[in-house]
UniProtKB/Swiss-Prot annotation:
<feature type="binding site">
    <location>
        <position position="199"/>
    </location>
    <ligand>
        <name>a divalent metal cation 2</name>
    </ligand>
</feature>
<keyword id="KW-0378">Hydrolase</keyword>
<keyword id="KW-0479">Metal-binding</keyword>
<protein>
    <recommendedName>
        <fullName>Aminopeptidase YpdE</fullName>
        <ecNumber>3.4.11.-</ecNumber>
    </recommendedName>
</protein>
<dbReference type="GO" id="GO:0070006">
    <property type="term" value="F:metalloaminopeptidase activity"/>
</dbReference>
<keyword id="KW-0170">Cobalt</keyword>
<feature type="active site" description="Proton acceptor">
    <location>
        <position position="198"/>
    </location>
</feature>
<keyword id="KW-0645">Protease</keyword>
<dbReference type="GO" id="GO:0006508">
    <property type="term" value="P:proteolysis"/>
</dbReference>
<feature type="binding site">
    <location>
        <position position="166"/>
    </location>
    <ligand>
        <name>a divalent metal cation 2</name>
    </ligand>
</feature>
<feature type="binding site">
    <location>
        <position position="221"/>
    </location>
    <ligand>
        <name>a divalent metal cation 1</name>
    </ligand>
</feature>
<dbReference type="GO" id="GO:0046872">
    <property type="term" value="F:metal ion binding"/>
</dbReference>
<comment type="similarity">
    <text>Belongs to the peptidase M42 family.</text>
</comment>
<feature type="binding site">
    <location>
        <position position="308"/>
    </location>
    <ligand>
        <name>a divalent metal cation 2</name>
    </ligand>
</feature>
<dbReference type="InterPro" id="IPR008007">
    <property type="entry name" value="Peptidase_M42"/>
</dbReference>
<comment type="function">
    <text>Has a broad aminopeptidase activity on non-blocked peptides by progressively cleaving amino acids off the peptide substrate. Aminopeptidase activity stops at the residue before the first proline in the peptide. Cannot cleave when proline is the first N-terminal residue.</text>
</comment>
<dbReference type="InterPro" id="IPR051464">
    <property type="entry name" value="Peptidase_M42_aminopept"/>
</dbReference>
Amino acid sequence: MDLSLLKALSEADAIASSEQEVRQILLEEADRLQKEVRFDGLGSVLIRLNESTGPKVMICAHMDEVGFMVRSISREGAIDVLPVGNVRMAARQLQPVRITTREECKIPGLLDGDRQGNDVSAMRVDIGARSYDEVMQAGIRPGDRVTFDTTFQVLPHQRVMGKAFDDRLGCYLLVTLLRELHDAELPAEVWLVASSSEEVGLRGGQTATRAVSPDVAIVLDTACWAKNFDYGAANHRQIGNGPMLVLSDKSLIAPPKLTAWVETVAAEIGVPLQADMFSNGGTDGGAVHLTGTGVPTVVMGPATRHGHCAASIADCRDILQMQQLLSALIQRLTRETVVQLTDFR
């Protein structure tokens, strides 16, 4: 497993609409392998893996992470921020963060906020400034992006910890597929899509799908269980138990034919799956499957512990198994298979 790539993706700072640091990593890989690259109007990256007269398949992961944006600067030097995406309440107080200025300078600070019951409001970043002028002299302006200041770490037992695993694990899988299959003979035309602005409303998933117009889509994302050390039967997001196969969420109910086919292929190659349902939230799949006249879509990905906060934990074996499964699915997506998956008669 390429831990240096995962580290680079995790430590890149990219809230919605400001995903250039992640985009650059993907573009360097695509350029190195001389792949065609397109963009949608929001900045999503569309990499054409191969040419084929077969069906068109889209593999999608989002680039953005939850974070904050500078809203205003007080006379005393407090930097008021607003959340971008659904940042956990517990992660809105006393957290190291970094501000990325328009000049791409990184300025560390401490995030804090006012707690009222279970809510945290009036969030601000302290960079040690004593006045408005000192903040301005540091180059900070309203609109600058703020992300958690988290260093990627390798943990015991093939596990890793870092920020923005939602959805840099998906972006990592896009790159590994690009590397593995860049010169393979495939039965389908495959587009690897890194979408913009998922955390603020599944935006790039919609616009990128319009640009690709796929016959089938696989969306990569992550999720965690509310109680990280609950290993009971209801928890289908346990790290180390294999990738998640999301049967339904608030925005998408996956076609049973498609999920059954994924389960069959996974069993053939010996990859365990955790069949899961999200009672809250959704993924790019919600936007993807409603594009055009409808796109058969399934959501999969590695489970994590903790999410939408300063750091998550994942198991490298889950990531590798997800890569194995994606490769196997892509190599089996013949025109006949797609016809069978989309036949409603």
